[in-house]
From Swiss-Prot:
The protein's role, per its UniProt record: Regulates the dynamic behavior of MamK filaments; paralog MamJ also promotes MamK turnover. At least one other protein besides MamJ and LimJ is required for MamK turnover. Might connect magnetosomes to MamK filaments.
Acidic residues bias (residue ranges): 150-164
Disulfide bonds: none
A Gene Ontology term for the protein's cellular component: magnetosome
Subcellular location: Magnetosome
Species whose genome carries this gene: Paramagnetospirillum magneticum (strain ATCC 700264 / AMB-1) (Magnetospirillum magneticum)
This protein's name: MamJ paralog LimJ
Domain notes: The center of the protein is Glu- and Pro-rich.
Biased composition regions of type Low complexity, renumbered to the chain: 30-52
Sequence segments annotated as region (Disordered): 1-59, 145-176
Length: 319
């Protein structure tokens, strides 16, 4: 108990160690005195944090001679910090294996359009169209509509000139002078002929010329006019209605006559059949008698029907 009390009394309070404190010569148990040179900041505001630079992009190494991967890894646009001038100035170094792979790579095939334009015949190629350059100043000028052409004025027709009266008078005087000269010449010829002896010459009878109306030229040129038709009294009279040779018979009378004829024919056939059964030898005579009676009955029926139409009495023999 006494030992513990002494140890408690010998202990001294230790201050909290700060980064600026220095260790004493007595080791860890020695008291750390605060530094007299420590400057106390005037303001209590915290200092601004230093900017943290982005980590550099990982470099992709080519695997198995991949040329495209190495080119993309060294491209300045593939890294996130490509804006910095230090990283943009860095250039990738192509290894020898990659250079050999690029040199030995087969050439890429040209596109289809280039092959067609190269191997196609020259006459099938269409030349490029040349367009004239449009002057903006000329293009800005508005185009005005063409002025309508004036219609041609109608040419007035020249009026007929009136004939002068002096011309008629001059022509009349000329004709009068000519007639006077002709009459004087005729009188001189008559006087000369009276002085000379007259010798009678035999008269020559010339055939009269064919009249012009009967010449061949006029016959073909002017067709002969047809002679006017003379209408007779019979033709001028109006034609009456033609007589119809077939007489009109009422339908009722026609049907009654047909039924009567059929009735008599049936009765005659029945009587002939009964007589044939009774006496087969007298069949011929009875048939002739029955036929005659049938014919007479038919005639009588039709004469009776046609008698009112003719307006006269008809005997049984008339049909």
């Amino acid at each position: 108990m006494m030992m513990e009390h002494e140890m408690a009394t010998n202990r001294r309070p230790r201050a909290k160690r700060t980064p600026g404190d220095k260790l004493g010569k007595g080791g860890g148990d020695a008291a750390l005195a605060p530094a007299a040179d420590a400057e106390i900041p005037a303001s209590s505001a915290p200092e601004p944090a230093a900017p943290i630079s982005a980590p550099p992009a990982p470099v992709i190494k080519p695997v198995g001679g991949d040329a495209w991967a190495s080119l993309l890894s060294g491209s300045p646009w593939s890294s996130p910090g490509a804006a910095s001038p230090t990283e943009a100035a860095l250039k990738p170094v192509m290894p020898s294996a990659l250079a050999e792979a690029v040199a030995n790579a087969p050439p890429e095939a040209a596109p289809f359009t280039e092959l067609v334009s190269h191997w196609s015949p020259p006459f099938r190629r269409q030349p490029d169209r040349e367009y004239e350059e449009i002057n903006p100043a000329e293009a800005a000028i508005p185009v005005t509509a063409a002025a309508p052409e004036p219609e041609p004025e109608p040419v007035p027709e020249p009026e007929p000139e009136p004939e002068p009266e002096a011309a008629h008078d001059h022509a009349a005087t000329e004709t009068e002078g000519v007639t006077e000269m002709m009459t004087s010449d005729v009188e001189l010829e008559i006087e000369i002929a009276s002085d000379v002896e007259v010798v009678e010459a035999p008269a020559v009878i010339e055939p009269s010329p064919r009249p012009q109306a009967f010449s061949h030229s006029t016959a073909y040129a002017y067709p002969a006019e047809p002679a006017p038709a003379v209408e007779t009294a019979a033709e001028a009279a109006p034609a009456g209605p033609a007589e119809n040779p077939v007489k009109e018979v009422p339908v009722e009378d026609l049907f009654t006559g047909i039924f009567n004829v059929a009735d008599s024919a049936v009765r005659g056939a029945i009587g002939a059949s009964t007589d044939l059964l009774r006496d087969p030898k007298s069949l011929g005579g009875k048939l002739s008698v029955a036929g005659q009676s049938l014919v007479h009955s038919i005639k009588g029926r039709f004469n009776a029907l046609l008698a009112p139409r003719h307006g006269a009495k008809s005997n049984g023999d008339e049909f």
